[in-house]
Amino acid sequence: MVVFSKTAALVLGLSTAVSAAPAPTRKGFTINQIARPANKTRTVNLPGLYARSLAKFGGTVPQSVKEAASKGSAVTTPQNNDEEYLTPVTVGKSTLHLDFDTGSADLWGFSDELPSSEQTGHDLYTPSSSATKLSGYSWDISYGDGSSASGDVYRDTVTVGGVTTNKQAVEAASKISSEFVQDTANDGLLGLAFSSINTVQPKAQTTFFDTVKSQLDSPLFAVQLKHDAPGVYDFGYIDDSKYTGSITYTDADSSQGYWGFSTDGYSIGDGSSSSSGFSAIADTGTTLILLDDEIVSAHYEQVSGAQESYEAGGYVFSCSTDLPDFTVVIGDYKAVVPGKYINYAPVSTGSSTCYGGIQSNSGLGLSILGDVFLKSQYVVFNSEGPKLGFAAQA
C-alpha cells in the first residue's frame, strides 16, 4: 500500500514532464460527462439493472431477481438524480454518447446496420470513408436481465477529448434487444477494463485506452463521478484539485481482466472497523455496490424497517429513512460512502419505498464497487503495475 501526497504527485508530474520533453505528442486531457435526460416514457427496471450487474461478472442471478425483472415489479421513472451521465465520443463519422465502463473491454455502439425501428432516438455509428470492416470478425454480448447486442467489427477513427486513434476496433450493433433500444439516452459503451476480456471473435481487440495510452503523459486515467451531477474522466494525468488529502495506492489484480483489488476491512455507520477484508472490483459500469451477504445483512440491520423483498428483487426501505454510511478500508485510508448515496431510488414511480444502493453479490466470490461507491471518490486507474489509487473527492 503506497500513499502519495499532492506534493509528491506534483514532483512526479514535473519529473515526467521533463523526461517526456523530447516527445511533444504525448499529452493528457479531461473529458466531461453530460446529462442525458431520457424521454418521458423511459423507465428503469431496478432488478433488471441488478441482474445485469451480477451476470456481467459470471454470477448467479437469484430467482427472485429474475422474476422481479421479468414482471417489471420494481420499475421507476427516473427523477433528476437518476439521469444518465454519458460521455460524447467521436466514432467514425458520428458523435455517440457512450457509457464509460471499467468493468468491460468492448467499444460498441448503435449503428446504421440496425433495423430502422431500433434506430429511433439514438445517434448511430456510421463508418468513416477510411474504415475497414474486419472480415469474419463478430461480437456478441448478453446480460442476466435478457438484454443483448451483437454485430460486425470495424477498424476506424475514434476521438475522445484530445486524443485520436485511426486504428480502434469499433463494434457496430446489427442486432440489439429492446432493453437497450428503450434507453434512448445511451448509444453504447466504451470499455476501460483490460483488453484480455474483449469479446470480439475470433481474436480479441484492444480497448481504446490500451490503443492510445502510449500517446499520454502517463499510462493512466482517473475518474471523478459525481452524485446528482455529471462526472469527469482525466486521461494521462492526475488533477490534484479534484481530491483532498493523499492518494492511497494498492495493487490491482488484472488476472480476470478487471480492475480488481483487496480491501482491508469495512465499517457501517459509526461502528468500529471490521478487519475482514474482501476482494473487490472498481466498476464504473455497475450502478450499485454488491457485497457478501453477511455485510449486506449487517448494513440493513441498522436501517429501520429495511427488508429483503422478493417482489422487488432486493433490499428495500422507506424513502424517508436515514441510512448509515458505509466505509471501505484500504490500507490506512477509509473510503466513506455517505448514507444518502445508498438510498438509490423509489421502487416504482411515486412510491415511498426505496431500493437499496447496496445489494448482495449472490455468492459471486468478489464484491463490485460500482457508481454508488465511486461517486464519493477520486479513483486513479494506472496500467503501470497495475495499481489503483483512492482519495476523497474535493
Swiss-Prot record:
Residues 21-69 form a propeptide. GO terms for cellular component: extracellular region. It comes from the Eukaryota. Residues 1-20 form the signal peptide. Its main location: secreted. GO terms for biological process: proteolysis. It is found in: Secreted. Keywords: Aspartyl protease, Disulfide bond, Hydrolase, Protease, Secreted, Signal, Zymogen. Its EC number is 3.4.23.18. Residues 85-391 form the Peptidase A1 domain. The active site is at D101, D283. GO terms for molecular function: aspartic-type endopeptidase activity. CDD domains: Aspergillopepsin_like (cd06097). It catalyses: Hydrolysis of proteins with broad specificity. Generally favors hydrophobic residues in P1 and P1', but also accepts Lys in P1, which leads to activation of trypsinogen. Does not clot milk. Belongs to the peptidase A1 family. Secreted aspartic endopeptidase that allows assimilation of proteinaceous substrates. The scissile peptide bond is attacked by a nucleophilic water molecule activated by two aspartic residues in the active site. Shows a broad primary substrate specificity. Favors hydrophobic residues at the P1 and P1' positions, but also accepts a lysine residue in the P1 position, leading to the activation of trypsinogen and chymotrypsinogen A. This is Aspergillopepsin-1.
